[in-house]
Amino acid sequence: TCAGAAAGRCWSRVAVPEFSAYITSKHANLGFMRVMAKELGPRGIRVNAVCPGWVRTEAAMLSLQNMSKRTGRSEGDLLAEIVGARLAHGAQVLPGLLEPDDLAAPYLWLASDGAKDMTGQALMLDRGEVMA
């Protein structure tokens, strides 16, 4: 049995104003993953997605910087809101940002026999940002 995984980001389950193209692409990733799971399942191939929340990467920090410029709010205030330091709508329940290394274990689990009966599913790894 083979296992495949596609990144969907937690925003693949929500609608966020001013991010229409990004949100649309993430919704499409989940749809594609589900279709592939249906098509490849009869061959014993599993296809699942990992949907991470905010991960401390250059791209995420650039996004934060752009949000700051667009809204006139400080990066620190925005980050505090995102990571749940202030319980705002859409904030994470568990504080802090994911680190890139935090993503390895879920992918390894999906590729293991521990996930042999799982296909077409989105594994939310977002510190409670989206509870769907």
Mark where each language-model region is:
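Active-site helix of classical SDR
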Residues: S25, M33
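Short, flexible catalytic-loop segment of classical short-chain dehydrogenase/reductase
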Residues: L30, P52-L62, N66, R70-T71
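A short hydrophobic alpha-helix cap/turn motif
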Residues: L40-P42, V55, A111
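A conserved structural motif in NAD(P)-dependent oxidoreductases
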Residues: E75, H89-L103
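Short, small/polar-rich loop/turn modules that mediate ligand/substrate recognition or access, typified
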Residues: G41, R46, M118-G120
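Active-site loop immediately N-terminal to the catalytic Tyr-X3-Lys motif
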Residues: V14-A21, P42-R43, P95
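Short C-terminal tail/terminal secondary-structure segment
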Residues: V14, P95, P106-W109, T119-A132
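Residue(s) in the substrate-gating loop at a strand-loop-helix junction
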Residues: R9
